[in-house]
């Protein structure tokens, strides 16, 4: 899968499937965005479902990524979404999510779930703008003890 897109903020990007050489850049973005990253886990998720791992490129440099997983119950789940700090707020994350939703719809998956840190109000705002609604709370979800808000979007 590969598509050219202009984000809502006018950034020209290419959305494409993840490739193994992208892992170094993905981990750099991961380290900017999250407290704990695991390259081995990302590669394992890629091996399980390659179509669920997409990157956004600007001028041949990865500037963001989304990782989705399929649950045994047939649900879609956003495992990770991250954008290089220099491009946050530019619509890259929103564009990655739209591409991810298109993949899920093609597979006849009608809703997607995710968990987001209670403290990550910027991500919560993005997800709400994209149509996610809060459906629950999981205390002590993350390794550092922070809780997570569970959210769902009907596709």
Where are these regions (language model features)?
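Conserved catalytic-core motifs of GNAT/GCN5-like acyltransferases
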Residues: 115, 128, 133-149
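Conserved SAM-binding loop
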Residues: 15, 89, 116
